[in-house]
């Protein structure tokens, strides 16, 4: 995988959180409907599974497998079969499963990037990464929980806007950390 600095990663994640929060708060009704529909959106599921599968293959390509080098092709076939099999046979909550795998891959990128940075503020991102891993595992084994969580978050427009405001605040924090702390 190409290397990225913690500053750039923080700014990218911050900009994404900020943009999503601003869009969701300005188009709350439409965004709320999108959020509610996401868990059962097959097209989003196919895309997220594809992105996750390619990303995982890229990670595996760069790994030193030492004693298991002979099995590299088998691992690649297994990853492809798992991704394709998920799309064919696990269509129920496919978007949630794809998002869960992607959450864990993003968490790996965050932890790998923050590992050797000197600033204690890196722990903000590392904490988020560990929460993403826990969430990813939880949503993988019980994907209906994301549907329930989204239903709770969108049940009241005021609550939805508060959650969007929290996302905006977090995005600003990550942008500021990327600009001023993680240089």
Predicted features along the sequence, with ranges:
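Interfacial loop-to-transmembrane junctions
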Residues: 147-166
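Hydrophobic alpha-helical transmembrane segments of multipass integral membrane proteins
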Residues: 11-22, 50-57, 77-81, 104-111, ...
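Short juxtamembrane and helix-loop transition motifs at transmembrane-helix boundaries
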Residues: 29-40, 55-67, 83-94, 149-154
């Amino acid at each position: 995988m190409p290397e990225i600095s913690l500053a750039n990663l923080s700014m990218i994640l911050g900009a994404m959180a900020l943009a999503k929060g601003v869009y969701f708060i300005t188009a709350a009704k439409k965004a709320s409907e999108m959020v509610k529909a996401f868990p059962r959106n097959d097209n989003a599921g196919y895309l997220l599974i594809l992105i996750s599968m390619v990303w995982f293959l890229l990670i595996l390509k760069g790994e030193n497998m030492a004693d298991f080098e002979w099995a590299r092709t088998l691992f690649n076939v297994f990853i492809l079969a798992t991704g394709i099999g998920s799309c064919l046979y696990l269509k129920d909550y496919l978007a949630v499963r794809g998002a869960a795998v992607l959450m864990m891959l993003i968490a790996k990128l965050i932890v790998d990037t923050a590992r050797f940075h000197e600033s204690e503020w890196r722990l903000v991102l590392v904490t988020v990464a560990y929460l993403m891993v826990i969430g990813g595992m939880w949503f993988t084994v019980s994907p209906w929980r994301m549907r329930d969580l989204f239903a709770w978050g969108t049940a009241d427009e005021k609550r939805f806007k508060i959650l969007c405001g929290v996302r905006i605040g977090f995005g600003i924090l990550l942008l500021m950390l990327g600009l001023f702390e993680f240089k």
